[in-house]
From Swiss-Prot:
Region (Disordered): 117-143
Family under the similarity heading: Belongs to the RraB family.
Keyword Nucleus among record annotations: no
HAMAP family in UniProt: RraB
Single GO molecular function: enzyme binding
Organism: Proteus mirabilis (strain HI4320)
Intracellular or extracellular location(s): Cytoplasm
GO cellular component: cytoplasm
Acidic residues compositional bias, start-end: 117-135
Protein name according to UniProt: Regulator of ribonuclease activity B
Keyword Cytoplasm: yes
Gene: rraB
Pfam families named among the record's database cross-references: RraB
Record Gene3D superfamilies: RraB-like
């Protein structure tokens, strides 16, 4: 079971992220892609965790390597769900994924999402923003 102190820290972080998004003018009624970050030193271990995360109903992104401040290389993926900015729902996801991470021997590294412009125009068929926004523009808004 996830450490209660770490869970409390994550709950506080969740509320801070939501507060900052709303203060910045993000759409309070939008559906957000909630990206939970999972990492590990070992690809095989990470792959097993990704399978379990997928079984829980999350979309799992392709694994990629990242270098952390110490110079160590980790492999990571995101477990993605779509929801409103509901702190209790996100808390439940965080706890679920922290427990799984502990069980599988991987790290839960928090979550993030993107600013949702309340004035953006969306294509009715696929919900994609009609504005031509590059991936680099989007990544700069990750909270």
């Amino acid at each position: 079971m996830a450490d209660s102190k770490e869970l409390a820290e994550q709950r506080e972080e969740t509320r801070l992220i939501i507060e900052e998004l709303l203060e910045d003018g993000s759409d309070p009624d939008a559906l957000y892609a909630i990206e939970h970050h999972i990492s590990c030193e070992n690809f095989e271990t990470l792959e097993k965790a990704a399978v379990e995360v997928f079984k829980l109903g999350y979309e799992v992104t392709e694994p990629e390597e990242i270098e952390i401040e110490s110079g160590e290389i980790l492999v990571c993926f995101d477990a993605v769900s779509e929801s409103g900015l509901n702190a209790e729902l996100i808390d439940a996801q965080v706890e679920q994924l922290m427990n799984l991470a502990e069980k599988m021997g991987v790290y839960y590294d928090g979550w993030g999402t993107y600013f949702e412009d309340p004035d953006a125009e969306y294509d009715d068929e696929d919900g994609e923003n009609e504005d031509d926004e590059s991936e680099s523009d989007k990544s700069s808004r990750l909270h």
